[in-house]
Amino acid sequence: MSGNTFGTLFKVTTFGESHGLALGAIVDGCPPGIELCEADLQRDLDLRKPGTSKHTTQRREADEVKIMSGVFEGKTTGTPIGLIIENTDQRSKDYGNIADTFRPAHADYTYDQKYGFRDYRGGGRSSARETAMRVAAGAIAKKYLKQQFGIEIQGFLSQLGPIKLEVKDLSQVYDNSFFSPDPDAIPELEEYMTALRREGDSVGAKITVIAKNVMPGLGAPVFDRLDADIAKAIMSINAVKGVEIGDGFDVVEQKGSQHRDEMTPEGFLSNHAGGVLGGISSGQDIVVHMALKPTSSITIPGKSIDRAGNPIEVITKGRHDPCVGIRATPIAEAMLAITIIDHLLRHRAQNADVVCSTPIINGQA
């Protein structure tokens, strides 16, 4: 299986399955000299880990990361950083009934068609459990970006099913299990999710993630556009079916006079473009939205086929998230951070000596 590595200079390779012995990652290309320990990664992992809320999967994993290489005397050496998280709460017997059947709208069928063989336990490699290693790698990227360049990345839940959330207080996003920017909406979210779980159904969600203080100049024209790589990074997350940069699909209804981000000596007057112009960062906030589908692992019977092509009825057992978007915020932050650090290192490698006489204007006046 190829396709397990992301990045050009800052490369992240992940490995492992949902019910395997462990998950792992190799982070290659990390700059040397960064103070780094497991605690730097554990905060983000604790935000993502399962079993922390009644509204997410009840699989309980400590997700304690071990740094195996690439750090000496508390600092990165510039060599590959090896990361491992052991799986400790697998319950593979829950999946025996799908060994020869396919859950509708799941990766079961396509993995079988591609490889002729699949690890059906918890979805194997297609499980969102894989994203734990992205979060660990992303925490390294986030620390470097903040320490060296003041770049900060903040995500939050912007919609759960029909409930759209206002951005009232971003400081409380990490203090509630929904990553809600509106503390007043939490009772409504809890009531909705409780009813959904009783129904045995699932629902989709929308996550917004913003990168602040990104310098202008990251990205390249045509095939290495910053927004194109952001879209690829976000689309690689399990269950993501749509990505928007800035105003996204809303631009269809806008006129040029509305959409253009006019400039003054004091700064940009708007940020409809989401911080990227011509595939290159403008110095404004990079604003990304992602839409996650409802998980197909539900207890409501659904039609499907078995490996012989016979019609069957599927009821998914096991422990699953009724809304995968609830735990997706740290994953989105990680993938945006990994993309930005990779482009920053690439930009520095080619353009470190570039001198531009045009002043850098503020992100927004």
Swiss-Prot record:
GO terms for biological process: amino acid biosynthetic process; aromatic amino acid family biosynthetic process; chorismate biosynthetic process. One of its GO terms (cellular component) is cytosol. Reduced FMN (FMNH(2)). InterPro entries: Chorismate_synth, Chorismate_synth_AroC_sf, Chorismate_synthase_CS. Signal peptide: none annotated. The keyword Endoplasmic reticulum does not apply. Its EC number is 4.2.3.5. It catalyses: 5-O-(1-carboxyvinyl)-3-phosphoshikimate = chorismate + phosphate. NADP(+) binds at residue 48. Keywords: Amino-acid biosynthesis, Aromatic amino acid biosynthesis, FAD, Flavoprotein, FMN, Lyase, NADP. FMN binds at residues 125-127, 238-239, 278, 293-297, 319. Transmembrane segments: none annotated. Its cofactor is FMNH2. PANTHER family: CHORISMATE SYNTHASE. Belongs to the chorismate synthase family. Homotetramer. This is Chorismate synthase.
